[in-house]
């Protein structure tokens, strides 16, 4: 029987893929692993403790913060600061980027951007939620505090990205630019084991994921694409299946495994879409491209967009390559 590889063993193995690697990125990923275990424990007992529901505060986007959002944010920040490989973090839950003040952190080479608990409003009803993270090499001089420019880098500069999905089982999925690998958590041992090696998304899928309750507000091209998905054309595998959980990590994870497309377009009330370029779209774009798929804002590759602000939003279309190409064609054919 083949020995099961742990996440820690796999990270050390893959360190050899990077010439002159000194282990700093490996240590950084280990800190994310630790924080994920802590957050997973709290999520699993959320219904028994006073940590579900709203905190009474809003984040910078005006969205009501959940208690577990804030808990996850603090745990990930603490884990990242403790390892000394990160000079600062930017979080969906923070108004501004946070610079770590310890001298060792100032000498660190990396910054981390994260959505500490995506889909947290679903916890009350026991729906899967997740953590999304993105890692960049800083551009400011080592030994100085991080600057805004360290965080406002296009997605094509990412050195690693991934997510943790807290569901029927807990998984950590990540890439360092050499494919996508998934690890399933064994709570009895407190260990992540390699369970999904070299994950690939099919070029074609049969699932489309979108909140159709907003249909009336969608651009014409998106409306036409939805009708295309619903047409009865058996020889082309249509109609497709509509599956929408409302938790980006959960919808993305299913489509990555099965093949499909996730759509969050612009609407009349949100002309730039609702998802954040830095905390959600860029890391998912890096993952999907490494798995053989595509991510677009409807006209441009997501990872080529130069950010102008920390909490910038963009329309988001991500998934199987041919499905993303198709929705781009509809948006080009039916401009509003």
Curated annotation (Swiss-Prot):
Mg(2+) 1 binds at residues 92, 115, 117. Binds 2 magnesium ions per subunit. Mg(2+) 2 binds at residues 115, 118, 280. Substrate binds at residues 118-121, 211, 244, 262-264, 274. It comes from the Bacteria. NCBIfam families: PRK09293.1-1, PRK09293.1-3. It is found in: Cytoplasm. This is Fructose-1,6-bisphosphatase class 1. One of its GO terms (biological process) is fructose metabolic process. Belongs to the FBPase class 1 family. Pathway: Carbohydrate biosynthesis; gluconeogenesis. GO terms for molecular function: fructose 1,6-bisphosphate 1-phosphatase activity; magnesium ion binding. Keywords: Carbohydrate metabolism, Cytoplasm, Hydrolase, Magnesium, Metal-binding. One of its GO terms (cellular component) is cytoplasm. Homotetramer. Its cofactor is Mg(2+). Pfam families: FBPase, FBPase_C.
